[in-house]
Design a protein with these regions (language model features):
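PRPP-associated nucleotide enzymes
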Residues: 1-231
Length: 231
């Protein structure tokens, strides 16, 4: 099956396809890679606003590597004062055949008004398996009790939605709304989705390997901490 596109229209089709193509270009530099994710984040934000105009109190959830580009692009396009949860995690393979991975959250930054939210938006560069998003949801859902959970990514693997739905009881999964622009169904022998987002995200963003990216403090977090200290 060739890549399937979703949620494209006259307004966003060219920009979204150009950004997705930029991600998979050979030897793309980190500045261009970051810019492509910023553009895709912006377009996801516009799409969310169009589909769900009544978001209420919002908490945006992302991994640390997605915060400054994909997540910030989404936040800036929402024109909405929203909370932010940034999670740092390690992805660990616990079995090779079949391949089973878990994601362990080792630190977090959560900035939100009040104890609960109406809408939780989980945004990720690519949803290949349920691993990372499952950990993020387990970490936060009971804490903030969202009424709606929007799971958004520029690219998803064909079975990602079903995998995530199966990881949670109906009381949680019934709240899920999935949004993407591209669905792929091919993996290489290492499990990397093709064409996906061009491979491993961390080094392409200029953040190094998994250990190095976990030492990166996103600028969006720095800005929020500084703003709260000045308030």
């Amino acid at each position: 099956m060739a890549r399937i596109f979703e949620n494209l229209n006259h307004e966003n089709k060219l920009k979204v396809k150009q950004a997705l193509t930029q991600l998979i270009m050979p030897n793309v530099d980190s500045a261009e890679y970051r810019m492509a994710f910023s553009e895709l984040g912006s377009e996801l934000g516009i799409l969310i606003t169009e589909k769900y105009p009544d978001l209420g109190n919002v908490l945006l959830v992302c991994a640390s590597e997605d915060a400054d580009w994909l997540a910030k692009g989404l936040i800036d396009s929402l024109h909405h004062n929203i909370g932010l949860a940034v999670l740092w995690s390690n992805r660990i393979t616990i079995c090779q055949d079949p391949k089973i991975e878990v994601s362990e959250i080792n630190k977090s930054y959560v900035d939100m008004e009040g104890d609960t939210c109406d809408t939780m938006i989980v945004v990720k560069s690519i949803i290949s398996t349920s691993c990372v998003v499952k950990s993020q949801l387990n970490y936060l859902v009971k804490r903030v009790n969202p009424q709606k959970i929007i799971i958004a990514a520029p690219v998803m693997f064909v079975s990602a939605k079903e995998s995530l739905m199966n990881e949670f009881p109906a009381s949680v999964s019934s709240k899920f709304k999935f949004l993407t622009f591209a669905i792929d169904d091919v993996r290489d022998d290492k499990g990397v989705v093709l064409p996906g987002v061009g491979g491993m995200v961390y080094p392409k963003l200029g953040l190094g390997n998994q250990v190095e990216k976990n030492s990166y403090m996103p600028q969006i977090v720095r800005d929020r901490v500084f703003a709260s200290s000045r308030a």
